[in-house]
Amino acid sequence: MKRRTFLLGAGAVATAAAQPGFRLVDVTAAAGIHFRHNSGAFGQKFLPETMGPGCAFLDYDGDGWLDILLVNGMDWPGHKQRKSTLRLYRNNRNGTFANVTERAGLAVEMYGMGVAVADYNNDGHPDLLITGVGQNRLFQNTGKGTFVDVTAKAGLGGRSAFSTSAMWFDFDRDGHLDLFVCNYVKWAGEHDVFCSVDGKHKSYCTPEAYHGSTCWLFRNRGNGTFEDVTAKCGIFDTSSKSLGVALLDYDHDGWPDLLVANDTQPNKLYRNMRNGMFEDMAVRAGVAFSEDGKARAGMGIDVADFDNSGRPGIAITNFDNELMALYRSTREGVYTDAASKIGIGQASRNSLGFGCAFFDADLDGYLDLMAVNGHIDETVRHIHSNVGYAQPPHLFLNDGRGNFRDVAGEVGGGFAAPKVARGLAYGDFDRDGDVDVLITTNQGPAYLYRNDVFSGNRSLRLRLVGTRSNRDAIGAVVRVFTPDGTQSRMVKTGSSYLSQSELTLTFGLGRREKADRIVIEWPGAGVQEHKNVGAGAYNCAEGKSISAQPRV
């Protein structure tokens, strides 16, 4: 998170446009979400205090309604004043949530950072990986509304690091989900570095003050345990300072690849060589550095086919004055940062971005882009008068013609109010067919925004269930064909920053009443096709016919 200033060309000029056909309504209090992040801050300005927390949408009890998990920190040893734990909220199916943390066995104190959700043992129940400072924790879902800590039993214990984002994926396509964990820098409270803006008072350090730390890759043995294959697979790299990770198929070979956002170090694009090894392609692909060849402060990340070209684009949030990156595939295997040309670059100049996500907010068939922002230094205005500590989010609406317009201030609900935001996740918690938003803030509350689409646009929602491939179908690619074009989505964990969105895929149909054709490419190489599928929500099991979900 280096403080640098770039002078880049002007971005695209937005023309007059119609008001968005949706509103984001703040329903946090009405929904019963009462949470405040504990960073443990006590005046010493330890680096981890300013980095968290993450959040997740998940259906932990399998009732078909999305629940909410919020990651929390804790007081530092020797300065304990209160107990703070993870927070799990169960969806009451009426717009409200109940705090079931204690009942679920998650009232655990740890200095948490991020969360990754997936059914790693293929038993039909989503499990939790919570990252943090110290030891990460793996909680297995019992299927009875509770979780048990299986960290040591699974072979993930005995490691201490400053872990951030994480991702479940099946890199060897054996049907068992493997685990990738981002690690940030080598940090310990007893070795904290003194950094200062004025030479007198301690401030939060930027990562240049610390050595990097390698990410970890764990292979799922299929028996409930994991093997550390970081070095064996070519991932080991102690120069990295990793904060975000996203899943993609970079070379369109059907094998999952990895894109890692690094802070003040080159980003990494790990291409799956299909033999248990990965090769870093980031420099060759054009995503390692900024356009002028410098490493930026990459935080949040997402990958999606935002222009319906069939090729995934890449969004990465960066430090203020570095501009948010939006990489577009210009030729096979090569990307160019188009952010400044399509309305995102200059709009994000004064933002320090964290969580980001592509989703179709207005259900028009084109993926929009949300980014949440907030500085790490509460005194930043004394240094840069145009940069605030609390910052408004961005909601870039995709016009379908290659341009984006920030409509955060036009969607109501106080959405554009400045926040010291970190985590971002999306999911349809009220089952009305559009995608709602969950945001966490550093040393502050969480926010739940209900999306109300009033334009008349419809959606097609698909929940995939693997039978031969991993049960969550992570890595599956779905293509939806309508007369307006072809949309493609991948089922994925990870992405954003420290957070996890729902695994169900949402396709905007606009005013169309159906999709002409749906093609599902499963992670195990099988392909299914369904024709004339009407708007609505469906379950799609591998090798079986599509079935409509019960109406609310």
Q: Could you say what each language-model-derived stretch is?
A:
Residues M1-L7, G222:
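Twin-arginine (Tat) signal peptide motif
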Residues T5-Q19:
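N-terminal export signals
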Residues R23-R36, A41-L47, A98-M110, V150-F162, ...:
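Short loop/turn motifs that recur once per blade in beta-propeller domains
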Residues A41-F42, I344-Q346, R381, S385-V552:
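Gly/Ser/Thr/Pro-enriched helix-cap/hinge segments flanking short amphipathic alpha-helices
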Residues G52-G62, G112-N122, T164-R173, L177, ...:
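Beta-propeller blade termini
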Residues I68-N72, D127-G132, L179-N183, L258-A261, ...:
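Hydrophobic beta-strand segments that make up the repeating blades of beta-propeller
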Residues N72-Q81, V185-A209, V372-G388:
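Short, conserved, GDST-rich strand-edge loop motifs in beta-rich repeat architectures
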Residues G105, Y111-A116, V133-Q135, Q140, ...:
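Asp-box/WD-like beta-propeller blade repeats and closely related beta-sheet repeat scaffolds
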